[in-house]
């Protein structure tokens, strides 16, 4: 019996090693292949004075991006595409109020592949992609192949192979591919970026990021809408499937993939999967399709990333549990810590005018002088307009403002294709780690060792 158990243990251990080594070999294969294009880390294209944009997906996120884009100077909407006719016509009617230049807008709906027809017929400069997760990679790849820059909702892709395909296509076509991580444009995130750049909290050591947002109500969206497809991801996958809202900002605080440091490995663990099944059991008939699913994804996932410099980043995801919203947004250095939800600061020796030591947080009105001195220049310039326009407190508008500004002036984007893939890679890597009882997973280096020559993100004036 002892020998039998030992054989089973060896067999299971070997399977885990094989699975991990297979992923590693796949990553090394891509790493060792020379790129057929040019590195895109600091890429800038020639200025586009009048940006002709098409939109794919007009359900949840698309309408907000459409409004923010269309209200900016130098923009023209040339096509709208969605599975559903009412979404397309509703946004077309709204568009007339936003942008008088967009008079000849082509409308597409009804067929799963209408977006491909749209790309061929309209030939836009840029395409905004706001669809279900599985469509992100094929849509951004085809967009670039058809000659347009791609701007995609999060996550950028759901497998590392898709991410390599995106990187290779971007390098080959010399087209931007930006995953639109809007949280990087939040007021507090911009403030913290500025504080980190100015060395206020010393050498950066540790970060904590999250997307904890109870979204069980989306299961009401059963035939169309986010819940109609996202619920199946909860059932079929187990890991951190939505890492970038919390991770994007702290990665840029740390200059991850931008000349200073890079993610190295991740370990991941999930709790039991209980909340979705209990919610379905309570709210739907026994034979309802949500009660026929076996929910695989744990209610809460916790992942821990190790960087090349030895820093640590904790990333959590929970869209199921009854608890308040948070993204953590914590960055810790040798002389202080910045944290979110609520916004608070602790500095060695205290925050001037607020606290006497690092043993208590400065928060609320006590942070007024810190905002006054260290407010990010971009928020000083556009923040009031962004808050008026709305979209998650103005962060959505600021993101679109910067996209348009960079394209019109021929500047590098604030988020490059490698960052979008790296941040999204926590998804499939965490799934692999959870499946292997927390075994470390190596991050692919989508830059092929060129990250250490990439410039840090500027503090944009």
Tell what function each PLM region has.
Residues 1-148, 164-176:
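N-terminal glycine-/serine-/threonine-rich beta1-alpha1-beta2 phosphate-ribose binding loop
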Residues 10, 66, 92, 116-119, ...:
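Non-transmembrane alpha-helical segments in soluble domains
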Residues 12-16, 30-41, 64, 322-461:
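C-terminal helical cap and adjacent loop that interface with cofactors, partners, or active-site loops
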Residues 57, 172-178, 183-295, 328, ...:
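Predominantly a Rossmann-like dinucleotide-binding segment in NAD(P)-dependent oxidoreductases
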Residues 147-159:
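ADP-ribose/adenylate-binding Rossmann-like module
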Residues 292-295, 301-305:
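Short N-terminal edge-element motif at the start of the domain
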Residues 303-309, 333:
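Active-site beta-strand termini and strand-to-loop segments that position acidic
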């Amino acid at each position: 019996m002892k020998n039998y158990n030992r054989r089973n243990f060896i067999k299971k251990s070997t399977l885990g090693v094989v699975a991990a080594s297979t992923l590693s070999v796949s990553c090394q294969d891509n790493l060792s292949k020379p790129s057929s294009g040019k590195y895109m880390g600091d890429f800038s294209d020639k200025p586009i004075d009048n940006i002709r944009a098409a939109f794919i997906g007009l359900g949840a996120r698309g309408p907000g991006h459409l409004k923010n884009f269309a209200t900016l100077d130098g923009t023209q909407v040339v096509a709208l595409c969605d599975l559903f006719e009412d979404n397309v016509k509703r946004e077309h009617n709204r568009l007339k109020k936003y942008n008088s230049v967009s008079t000849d807008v082509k409308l597409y709906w009804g067929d799963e592949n209408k977006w491909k027809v749209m790309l061929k017929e309209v030939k836009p400069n840029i395409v905004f992609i706001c669809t279900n997760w599985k469509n992100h990679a094929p849509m951004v790849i085809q967009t670039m192949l058809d000659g347009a820059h791609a701007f995609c909702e999060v996550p950028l892709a759901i497998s590392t192979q898709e991410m390599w395909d995106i990187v290779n296509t971007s390098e080959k076509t010399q087209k931007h591919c930006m995953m639109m991580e809007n949280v990087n444009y939040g007021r507090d995130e911009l403030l913290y970026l500025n504080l980190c750049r100015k060395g206020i909290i010393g050498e950066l050591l540790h970060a904590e990021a999250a997307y904890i947002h109870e979204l069980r109500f989306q299961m009401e969206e059963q035939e169309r809408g986010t819940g109609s497809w996202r619920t199946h991801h909860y059932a079929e996958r187990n890991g951190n499937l939505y890492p970038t809202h919390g991770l994007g900002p702290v990665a840029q605080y740390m200059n991850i993939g931008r000349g200073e440091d890079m993610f190295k490995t991740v370990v991941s663990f999930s709790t039991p999967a209980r909340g979705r099944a209990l919610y379905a059991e309570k709210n739907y008939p026994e034979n309802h399709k949500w009660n026929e699913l076996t929910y695989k994804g744990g209610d809460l996932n916790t992942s821990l990333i190790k960087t090349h410099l030895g820093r640590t980043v904790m990333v959590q995801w929970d869209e199921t549990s009854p608890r308040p919203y948070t993204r953590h947004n914590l960055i810790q250095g040798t002389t202080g810590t910045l944290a979110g939800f609520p916004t608070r600061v602790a500095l060695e020796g205290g925050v001037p005018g607020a606290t006497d030591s690092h043993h208590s947080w400065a928060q609320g009105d006590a942070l007024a002088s810190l905002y006054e001195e260290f407010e990010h220049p971009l928020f000083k310039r556009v923040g009031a307009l962004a808050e008026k326009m709305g979209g998650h407190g103005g962060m959505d508008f600021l993101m679109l403002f910067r996209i348009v500004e960079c394209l019109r002036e021929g500047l590098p984007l604030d988020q490059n294709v490698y960052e979008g893939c790296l941040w999204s890679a926590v998804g499939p890597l965490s799934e692999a780690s959870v499946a292997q009882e927390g075994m470390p997973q190596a991050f692919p280096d989508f830059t092929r060792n060129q990250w250490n020559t990439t410039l840090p993100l500027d503090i944009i004036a």
